[in-house]
UniProtKB/Swiss-Prot annotation:
The lineage of its organism: Eukaryota, Viridiplantae, Streptophyta, Embryophyta, Tracheophyta. It catalyses: a thiol + S-adenosyl-L-methionine = a methyl thioether + S-adenosyl-L-homocysteine + H(+). CDD domains: AdoMet_MTases. It is an enzyme of class 2 (transferase). The keyword Methyltransferase applies. It comes from Arabidopsis thaliana. Disruption phenotype: No visible phenotype under normal growth conditions. The modification Phosphoserine is found at S86. Belongs to the class I-like SAM-binding methyltransferase superfamily. TPMT family. This is Probable thiol methyltransferase 1. Gene3D superfamilies: Vaccinia Virus protein VP39. Its EC number is 2.1.1.9.
Length: 227
């Protein structure tokens, strides 16, 4: 395993996770050449830890995640979807990439939890399901979209949540690098697009479970839909 330094790549189970600054130097070219499918086809997935996000596991262990219908936009390989799924929490993993969803289904299609989650190919900006969600979890989706699309993201989060629903954002990467994806974010990046549509931040804190290359570069924010 790579030495745990904040400014160098880090390996988890064979997955090399670069810093966001490093990822922003090569990932955009692959996306430009063939979209997100090309990233998955070529194995250029620096956002994918190959396992559930440690923070999600921590929240589950401490019973700090709401129950009910849950959405993970940009679910990728589906690790967080399956981790959160339970008889009391049905989870929908959404992605526009066939390759990502194929991988998710190959990995988790025979999971004993299979009846408690589903993977759906849809665009979160246009998809309107028959039933709204109690919880949405966004980690590396917000930072992957073009910054000018962020107001539309905020509107979609509002439209997809039930009244009094909760949005959990693991805000990353909180850096000052140029370019993307991943694009740099700040708390204000979220406030600017969530507060005007009816969200209130109920807590903002450092992520105690960051992997080494992301330590000090991400924060956990929990938002309530108040109107």
């Amino acid at each position: 395993m790579a030495e745990e330094q904040q400014n160098s790549s880090y390996s988890i189970g064979g997955n090399i996770l670069p810093t966001p600054e490093e990822a922003a130097t090569f990932q955009p070219q692959v996306v430009a050449e063939g979209g997100w499918d090309k990233c998955w086809e070529d194995g250029v997935t620096p956002w994918d830890q190959g396992r559930a996000t440690p923070l999600i596991l921590h929240l589950l262990d401490s019973s700090a995640l709401p129950l009910g219908r849950t959405l993970v936009p940009g679910c990728g390989g589906g690790h967080d979807v399956v981790a959160m799924a339970s008889p009391e929490r049905f989870v929908v993993g959404l992605d526009i990439s066939d390759k990502a969803l194929n991988k998710a289904n190959e990995t988790y299609g025979s999971s004993p939890k299979a009846e408690y989650f589903s993977f759906v190919k849809e665009d979160v900006f246009t998809w309107r399901p028959n039933e709204l969600f109690d919880l949405i979890f966004d980690y590396v989706f917000f930072c992957a979209i073009e910054p000018e699309m962020r107001p539309a993201w905020g509107k979609s989060m509002h439209e997809l949540l039930k009244p009094d629903g909760e949005l959990i954002t693991l805000m990353y990467p909180m850096t000052d690098h140029e370019g993307g994806a991943p694009y740099k974010v700040a708390l204000s990046s979220y406030e600017d697009v969530l507060v005007p549509v009816g969200f209130k931040a109920v807590s903002v804190e450092e992520n105690p479970d960051s992997i080494p290359t992301r330590k000090g570069k991400e924060k956990l924010a929990r938002w309530k839909k108040i109107n």
